[in-house]
Amino acid sequence: MTPVIIKNIECFITRPDRHNLVTVRVTTEQGITGHGCATFQQRPLAVKTLVDEYLQPLMIGRDANNIEDLWQMMNVNAYWRNGPLMNNAISGVDMALWDIKGQLAGMPLYQLFGGKSRDAIPAYSHASGETLEALFASVDALIAQGYRHIRCQLGFYGGTPSALHAPDNPTPGAWFDQQEYMSNTVEMFHALREKYGWKLHILHDVHERLFPQQAVQLAKQLEPFQPYFIEDILPPQQSAWLEQVRQQSCVPLALGELFNNPAEWHDLIVNRRIDFIRCHVSQIGGITPALKLAHLCQAFGVRLAWHGPGDMTPIGVAVNTHLNIHLHNAAIQEFIPRSATTNDVFPGAPEVKEGFVYPPVQPGIGVGFNEALALAHPVLYRPHEWTQSRLPDGTIHTP
């Protein structure tokens, strides 16, 4: 097979809307270019440094055909591995290599992987409101667009803002009352079922804001409302408690958007403590490890619901879609609407039609990258306040 030699690797950060999006471009000596998503919204400049200063000199002159070998080399080259910075940098290169391979084969990625398992993947999007009435309006708008799977949040992300029993001169942050949140969430599910019945598939994100005993309690309280799944009911470092949740509730559990290391998901999958894996593909190192994770999940009956937030490039969205179209155990795709400017920077990205996402059909990933327009929207970084979640006494908590 003719070698496809890597000539250059570049990293771009663009902010066409409210998120800093990180894109990696790999160029071969034959002039073929591939693009990948390396977005780490909270640390974009660090990812760019890793790509520019470390991965670029490591990869130039190597054969782009050998994706598995190149991924393994990038993974161990720094000796220390499996962190969010390095994984995202590796992901950008890895996705770009798959993009190149698809172009060389003349196939969209899902065909390169082995073809379709389904015609389209069901999508879900986010509904929220400060009041139940506002939440209903948000749900109604999504139903009108064809969605039948909707993530519902009442008030502040995961719950409502709390001014209860706050200390004098409280530390700045996103204050959060766990007991208030739990009560409001049960009320929300009851109201949603009363209004929409059982045809609407309701998802909810706890966003790891509970203590383990509270997670058990909430899972039991939500069981009568039959949620499609409850996401991140506990943080990764408390995942051993999922056995207790499992023993006391049959609510489907989804976990994984914060995972970086295979050791974080292996036991949960093998012991069947989760129903859905929610890993962020770039956060675990790209397409190459995502395929392996998906096959592990299939062997143990765990379904795929890749993390798909607004702070990922449309290239990453398309990768999720290609994986979902191919992989038999894919369940659903998270989908966040994009601005017109973002679509101009990344032309050809997937869209939702009547509640389903369809993959690009062009060879490779199938999403373009307008460099000139991307550079017209440069990076703008500021500290993220929403991650400074605090309990009513001012204690910092997992966001």
Curated annotation (Swiss-Prot):
Keyword Metal-binding appears in the UniProt entry: yes
Keywords assigned by UniProt, alphabetized: Magnesium, Metal-binding
InterPro entries from the UniProt entry: D-mannonate_dehydratase-like, DgoD-like, Enolase-like_C_sf, Enolase-like_N, Enolase_C-like, Mandel_Rmase/mucon_lact_enz_CS, Mandelate_racemase_C, Mandelate_racemase_N_dom
Keyword match Metal-binding: yes
Pfam family, one: MR_MLE_C
Chain segments annotated as coiled-coil in the UniProt record: none
UniProt-annotated binding residues for D-arabinonate: 207, 257, 278, 307, 334
Subunit text: Homotetramer.
UniProt similarity note: Belongs to the mandelate racemase/muconate lactonizing enzyme family. GalD subfamily.
Function: Has no detectable activity with D-mannonate and with a panel of 70 other acid sugars (in vitro), in spite of the conservation of the residues that are expected to be important for catalytic activity and cofactor binding. May have evolved a divergent function.
Name under which the protein is recorded: D-galactonate dehydratase family member Ent638_0932
Organism the protein comes from: Enterobacter sp. (strain 638)
